Amino acid sequence: MTAEQLPPELQRVHMVGIGGAGMSGIARILLDRGGLVSGSDAKESRGVHALRARGALIRIGHDASALDLLPGGVTSVITTHAAIPKTNPELVEASRRGIPVMLRPLVLAKLMDGRTTVMVTGTHGKTTTTSMVIVALQHCGRDPSFAVGGELGEAGTNAHHGSGDYFVAEADESDGSLLEYTPHVAVVTNIEADHLDFYGSTEAYVGVFDAFVERLAPGGALVVCADDPGSAALAERSAELGIRVLRYGSAGHAEAALAATLVSWEQRGTGAVAQIQLAGEADPRSMRLSVPGRHMALNALGALLAAIEVGAPVGEVLDGLAGFEGVRRRFELVGTAESVRVFDDYAHHPTEVRATLEAVRSVVRQSGSGRLLVVFQPHLYSRTKAFAAEFGSALDAADEVFVLDVYAAREQPLTGISGASVAEHVTVPVRYLRDFSAVAEVVAAAAGPGDVVVTMGAGDVTLLGPEIVAALRMRADRSEPGRPGVLQ
């Protein structure tokens, strides 16, 4: 691929915050299409290292001179307004030089131009469902381009420039940026109040999904989960506008006709087997999954319909879904030590927490008499304030809970809001741990043979999984001198 296949403004770019999940994916695609890319980020990361290996010139720290990393200068600067302040010295310098500054969603829309696009949005399950569509199409030999918010287990990457005619991407609803896109197939997994710090009201948040659906390309289709009240209502409103709607959901749950029905579902270890019925077919089909949880089976149904809609054969799609190994930080096994399994999960909304813990509970139940221990880090003060009681209720699915302090991300602290706000609503044994550095030792000391530990949240709680495994290993070494701890 050559830079001539990119729009002129994307042939030589500088990316502020290049190491982030969304930005690093854009950088990968630009590099794969022959573009020249420089960038900056606050710290080193796996994403930064991978992009350097592909040829990106990256500086740690933010300084106006970073715009000169590429010999000959840049044609544009790319950033994401959710995380990068306008006072950033590189953005200030770009403005002084008259260099256009583009936001990530607009750049992604430009990269999609000319391809059949499948976009997945919703309050929960976006990344997993998007990844399922990608894996299914790859299995069918379609080699789609893609950009997703997590790292695919199979591909080991969050973005790819494919040779096929398709582009599959996650549409982030958190800041309204999904309105930059014009998809051919739009999948909406669910709609539930979130990101009220940006939208101000539930009505405004729900409204952005209606606006997104109205941007469907002519002849496009909306795929929605009819089990979810929010997306089911969106389906009704969209159908009234003449938009073609394909619904999926559970048998006996939805009021409207379903294009794909989850007839039954059975947990098997860390996977599942489901019976599904497709509209127009006489007999049900079997759908095998390698990831646990009924919510995953519903996500797979949405991915199946999206893949079928762009011409993929049903049987091949189901085979592809059977091999889907999950997404990094979505119930990802970190390691096992002393018969304790440690997982990491990105859940950061009460509904996500509840769905994940229900799935984990079924895994624990099948494996014996072990307990479920959850290390939960609330994400954002505004979300913690809005959903403290709901988080507490969701965490009650565990046997023991360790609540950390709030991961602030882009927000300033709110008076009276902390991890304790969540902990006080948990009714099972709970500990509020303010000292992040001590968490691994405390959790390892509490875990026993057969237990499952899940670190959960969208912040740096993900760093604790390896530390807990290491602490368990150290405990084994201390208890039996000369015997190495088990680490897988």
Curated annotation (Swiss-Prot):
It comes from Mycobacterium marinum (strain ATCC BAA-535 / M). It comes from the Bacteria. InterPro entries: Mur-like_cat_sf, Mur_ligase_C, Mur_ligase_C_dom_sf, Mur_ligase_cen, Mur_ligase_N, MurCDEF_pg_biosynth, UDP-N-AcMur_Ala_ligase_MurC. It catalyses: UDP-N-acetyl-alpha-D-muramate + L-alanine + ATP = UDP-N-acetyl-alpha-D-muramoyl-L-alanine + ADP + phosphate + H(+). This is UDP-N-acetylmuramate--L-alanine ligase. The gene is murC. It holds the Pfam family Mur_ligase_C. Cell wall formation. Pathway: Cell wall biogenesis; peptidoglycan biosynthesis. GO terms for biological process: cell division; cell wall organization; peptidoglycan biosynthetic process; regulation of cell shape. It is found in: Cytoplasm.
